[in-house]
Each structure stands twice: as structure tokens, then as C-alpha cells.
């Protein structure tokens, strides 16, 4: 049981246009989404060809601890609203489920991340692909822990690679038990060291002006890999693709996480730390699709959508389109795309 801080799907968020109530080719996501309550003990594993489960992480405590601009706790609501009208560009054998939200209210960040970990573990055990809606980027720690917990039932030492699209390395120092939205990948490194696990971390879109020299030194010490945003924007992308290939070949599983501040503020103004020289979303989506085609990706999240700063829901809409691209790409991999 996930307790009172888990709230099952609120179907009110799934409202939109209806062109037909019978012709699936005219369906939008709000017509195809099904609620799933992770608190139920009698849930049976999904036996269809391909299923996705959305779960929101309504939290910005990590952002507050990181002295950023709070507001991302409301992100999952607005992302759902933007996803509602997306078209079903897949066959009816692809199923979409909404697993509700983890609410980090009147509990600690660490308790919230533990709840998310349990939820991710359960979603994976149901044979569904988790897509987490943030929430601050502290969502990454809970998502990773859930993936790790699930994979340990298969292999005591799973080989998991992390690909993070982010302007920040997020490997800041932290006090034990008090992480933030800027510490997750250092916390994961510490867990890997403690449990003798492989630590494989690649950060795409790093901004030199957003990280201290000590953080780059720490990244090198930890064996983390990173690609600067300027090298993606102005460099030879084939070199970046080769770097991705080298990284992905060494992994058995890949967890992909996107911090919305990786994007230029022209496309993503509603974030905690906006980036005037961030990446063009088209470039990021191209890399995400390439990573997905490795067929190793086990979980995905997009974080730091903050409605408080998001005039016209521009950033939430971008997050929805990124998620659309994820589902569209995986559906095509399974031969279920249209």
C-alpha cells in the first residue's frame, strides 16, 4: 500500500475534443486513457502487447532546498491537460493508463521519493512502461530507486545507465538524508558505490555557466560523462551520436530523464532555472528517439514544469509533445505505430 499520499487518477484532467466515439482513428488520448489504482492488491500484470502508465510526482521540495523557484508541484496537472487532446497515433493494441499522483505534502522529500520508488517498482511489475510527470527534478532519485528495486528481482547487480537531458550536472554535495533537485546523481553514485554497482551517467546539454568548476571536477572524479549544450547546437551531431552509441552499448538497461531547463527559455519559460541559451526541443527529441531505438530504455520522466511561470502552458505543452514522441517511437519499435 502506498498510503494517503498516493492519489489515484483524477479523470477530470482528461477532457478534450471528441471527433468520434466509435472510430479509433479519430480518438484522442482522453478517450483512450484508463485509470489504474496502484493501492489495489488484486492488480494483474498487463498481458497485452504494449502498455504505458503515467504517474505524477507532485513535489517541489527538492527545488526549495536547492534554492530554486518553486511551483513544479503543479506540473503533472498541466501536463495531463496538454496530453488530453493528443491523437492516438498507434493501434488499439497500445494501452494508456493513468496511475495517479504521489503528493509530497506533510511528508519529507525522502518519504515522497520512497513512495515513488514503490510505485515505479509496481508499474514495472505490471509489465507497463512508466512515464513520470514532474514535479521537481528530485523525481529522478525516486524513479531510479524504483527501477533498481525492480531489476534486482531479476539480477542482484543490474547494469543501469542514466541519460539525463539537463543544463545542470545535478551532482552537488548533500547532507546524508537531505538531497535536493541538484543532488540526485551524486546520491545515485553513492548508492552504486555502497552496493558495488556500475555507475553510468551521461548528462546531455550541460551549460558551462550553470555549473561550478568543482562540479565538473566532481563529474570527472565520479566517471560521469557529459556533453555541453554548445557542442550539440554548433558541433557535429554525428560525434554526439557516436558518444551515445558508446555509452548505450555498455548498458543493459537505460533510464532517461529530462529536466525542462535543458530547453531554451523561448520554448520552456516555465521552469525553475530558465536557460536563455538552452537547446532547441527538436534536437533533444531526435536524441531521445535515437536512445529509445536501442530498445534498452526501461523508464522515462520529464521534470520541472512549473505552471507558475508558464504563460499559455507553453512548457507543459512541450512536455506533452516530448511524451507523445516517446510513446510514438516505442509503438513503432513494437510495430504498433500508425
From Swiss-Prot:
User: Known EC number(s)?
Assistant: 3.5.3.8
Positions binding Mn(2+) 1 in this chain are: 137, 166, 170, 259
* Catalytic activity reported: N-formimidoyl-L-glutamate + H2O = formamide + L-glutamate
Annotated positions binding Mn(2+) 2: 166, 168, 259, 261
Single GO BP term: putrescine biosynthetic process from arginine, via agmatine
Annotated Gene Ontology MF terms?
agmatinase activity; formimidoylglutamase activity; manganese ion binding
User: What cofactor does this one take?
Assistant: Mn(2+)
- Cofactor-binding details, from the entry: Binds 2 manganese ions per subunit.
Superkingdom of origin: Bacteria
Q: Which UniProt keywords apply?
A: Histidine metabolism, Hydrolase, Manganese, Metal-binding
> Enzyme class, one word?
hydrolase
Which pathway or pathways does this protein act in?
Amino-acid degradation; L-histidine degradation into L-glutamate; L-glutamate from N-formimidoyl-L-glutamate (hydrolase route): step 1/1
Q: Which NCBIfam families match?
A: hutG (TIGR01227)
Q: Which family does it belong to?
A: Belongs to the arginase family.
Q: What is known about what this protein does?
A: Catalyzes the conversion of N-formimidoyl-L-glutamate to L-glutamate and formamide.
Q: What is this protein called?
A: Formimidoylglutamase
Species assigned in the record: Clostridium tetani (strain Massachusetts / E88)
Q: What gene name is given for the protein in this entry?
A: hutG
Amino acid at each position: 500500500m502506498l498510503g494517503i499520499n498516493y492519489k489515484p487518477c483524477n479523470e477530470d484532467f482528461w477532457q478534450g475534443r471528441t471527433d468520434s466515439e466509435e472510430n479509433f482513428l479519430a480518438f484522442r488520448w482522453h478517450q483512450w486513457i484508463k485509470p489504474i489504482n496502484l493501492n489495489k492488491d488484486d492488480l494483474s500484470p498487463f498481458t497485452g502487447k504494449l502498455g504505458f502508465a503515467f504517474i505524477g510526482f507532485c513535489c517541489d521540495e527538492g527545488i526549495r532546498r536547492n534554492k530554486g523557484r518553486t511551483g513544479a508541484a503543479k506540473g503533472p496537472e498541466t501536463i495531463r491537460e496538454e496530453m488530453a487532446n493528443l491523437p492516438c497515433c498507434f493501434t488499439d493494441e497500445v494501452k494508456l493508463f493513468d496511475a495517479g499522483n504521489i503528493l509530497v505534502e506533510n511528508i519529507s522529500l525522502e518519504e515522497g521519493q520512497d513512495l515513488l520508488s514503490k510505485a515505479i517498482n509496481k508499474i514495472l511489475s505490471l509489465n507497463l512502461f512508466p512515464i513520470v510527470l514532474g514535479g521537481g527534478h528530485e523525481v529522478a532519485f525516486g524513479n531510479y530507486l524504483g527501477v533498481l528495486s525492480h531489476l534486482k528481482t531479476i539480477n542482484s547487480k543490474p547494469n543501469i545507465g542514466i541519460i539525463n537531458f539537463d543544463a545542470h550536472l545535478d551532482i552537488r554535495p548533500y547532507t546524508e538524508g537531505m538531497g535536493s533537485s541538484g543532488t540526485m546523481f551524486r546520491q545515485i553514485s553513492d548508492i552504486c558505490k555502497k552496493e558495488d554497482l556500475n555507475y553510468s551517467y551521461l548528462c546531455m546539454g550541460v551549460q558551462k555557466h550553470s555549473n561550478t568548476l568543482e562540479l565538473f571536477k566532481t563529474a570527472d572524479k565520479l566517471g560521469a560523462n557529459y556533453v555541453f549544450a554548445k557542442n550539440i547546437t554548433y558541433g557535429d551531431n554525428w560525434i554526439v551520436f557516436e558518444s551515445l552509441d558508446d555509452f548505450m552499448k555498455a548498458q543493459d538497461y537505460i533510464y532517461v530523464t529530462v529536466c525542462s531547463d535543458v530547453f531554451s527559455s523561448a520554448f520552456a519559460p516555465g521552469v525553475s532555472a530558465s536557460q536563455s541559451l538552452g537547446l532547441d526541443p527538436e534536437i533533444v527529441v531526435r536524441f531521445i528517439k535515437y536512445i529509445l531505438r536501442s530498445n534498452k530504455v526501461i523508464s522515462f520522466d520529464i521534470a520541472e514544469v512549473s505552471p507558475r511561470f508558464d504563460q499559455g502552458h507553453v512548457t507543459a505543452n512541450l512536455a506533452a509533445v516530448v511524451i507523445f514522441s516517446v510513446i510514438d517511437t516505442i509503438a513503432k519499435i513494437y510495430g504498433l505505430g500508425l
